[in-house]
Amino acid sequence: MNRFSVIYLLNRQYHHIYCATQTEAYAILEHGLTQPGYKPIGIYDAKTELFYWEPTRQHQYNRASIERQGKIASQAIQVAQNLRHRDEAGPGQANSIAQLLQINN
């Protein structure tokens, strides 16, 4: 089961990569931080429906008001759920770790 999704921006569009474990998701998130053009957003946990921000965004999130935190967290979760539903509903190809590693090789 691909419980986690690493969410990132590429060419002004949201994308995600499925991961089976949180450790794997954090490794992909860290790898994305070093890739040109990638803007990692965070990790979505489909089982708990929680979102974990990448470090810079976590700092910004922590400084926001409670109302703002609720709004941006809801938006991030909605984006993650929409990406997952899109992949489940259509015959499109789901992103994988191999795809991310091959993009810049």
In which residue ranges do the predicted regions lie?
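Surface-exposed loop/edge segments in extracytoplasmic proteins
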Residues: 12-18, 50-53
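Short aromatic-glycine-(Arg/Gly/Cys) micro-motifs in beta-strand/loop hairpins
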Residues: 1-15, 45
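A short, charged, amphipathic alpha-helix used as a generic interaction element across diverse proteins
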Residues: 8-9, 19-42
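Short, mixed-charge low-complexity intrinsically disordered segments
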Residues: 33-105
